[in-house]
Amino acid sequence: MGYVVYKFEMLEKFCNEAFHKIGFSVEESKIISDVLLLSDLFGIESHGMQRLVRYHKGIEKGLIKLDAKPEVIFDTPVSAVIDAKDGMGQLVGHKAMEIAIEKAKQSGVGIVTVKNSNHYGIAGYYAKMASDAGLIGFSATNSEAIMVPTFGRLAMIGSNPIAMAAPAEPYPFFFDASTTVVTRGKLEMYNKMDKPLPEGWALDKDGHDSTDAPDVLKNIVAKNGGGIMPLGGSKEQSGSHKGYGWGMVCEFFCSILSQGLTSNKVNQGNKSGTCHSFMAINPAFFGSPEDIKAHFSTFLKELRESPKAEGQERIYTHGEKEVAATKDRKENDNRWRKFSLPLWKER
C-alpha cells in the first residue's frame, strides 16, 4: 500500500477550497476545515479529512442543508436549545459553544443543547474552545446507533463520545473518547484498508464476536443486528455495563434535554437528526482561576511522575500526546498524517 505525504499547509488549503466550492462561505469553510484538521493533527484520523467525501455525499443527498439557518428555540441566562435545521454539524457546534462560553463568562455556566444537526467532527474540538478561553469545556454528541447494549444483539446507541478540556500547565488537559470500544470511523478505516478488525471490537447480527469489517458495517446500515461493543466489551464481568451506561449519560444530555432524536432514530430516511451538548464552566465562580489551574497542574505532574510499571518509560496525562502529535505533524512532513490512497476508495 502506497503512502502520500502532505504538508499541513497543503491540506489546509485543499480542505478550505473544497468546502468553499461545495457551497459554504469562506468563513464557514474555515470553521469546518479547522475541526477536521485538528482531528488529524491530534492523531484522530477516523474523524479527520477522510470525512470530507462523506460530508459531500450528505449534502448531495439533502441530509446536510447548505442554506440552513439554525435557531435558538429556548433561552435562559445559563442555557439554550438550538434547532440546527439540518445544517452542518461543525457550524452549529461552533456557534453553540460560543453561546455557552458567553453565558459562562456572565453567569458562571453555560449549557447548550442542539437537535436536528449532523455529524460535528470530534467532540474535543468544542471542549477545547472553552479551555482556550480559560474555561472548563465539555461536549458530547449522539450518532447513528452502532453500540449494542449489554446482553443485546441490535445496535441501539451511538458511539456517543464525551469530551472535556481544562486549562493546565504545561499544556491543557484534553480528554475525548467514545463510549464504544471504537468509533464507526475506525471500522471504516479498517474496511478501506482491507484489514480484519481486532477481536473484542464488534459483534455480528447474532451477537457473537466478529472481525469482519464489511459485514459489521453492512449490518449497522441495514439495522440487521450486530454493531460495536460498549467500552468494556460485551460482558458485565469486563465492565460492559459501564460503557453502556456512559453512552446513556451522553444520550440524556444530547437528545433527551434537546427533545431531539435518540440514537436509534438518527439517520433514518432523508434526515440525520443528530443531537449535541455543550457546556462551559467559569472557574472564577469557584475561586481564583490561576489557583485552580495551578492545583490541577500539580496533580497532573504528580501523575506523570508516579511509579511506572516494569518496562514502561513514561506515564501520560490526557492532552500530552495530542500536543506532541500536533507539533510533530506540523514540523516534520514525513510524520504528517499518512494518507494512503486506499482511504479514499469507495465501498
Question: Language-model features: where?
Answer:
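Acidic, glycine/proline-rich low-complexity segments that act as flexible tails and inter-domain linkers
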Residues: 2-8, 13-32, 37-38, 46, ...
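Active-site cofactor/substrate anionic-group-binding motifs, chiefly glycine-
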Residues: 48-101
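Phosphate/diphosphate-binding glycine-rich loops and adjacent basic-rich segments that engage nucleotide
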Residues: 147-221
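Secondary-shell segments that build the walls of catalytic and ion/ligand-binding clefts
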Residues: 196-265
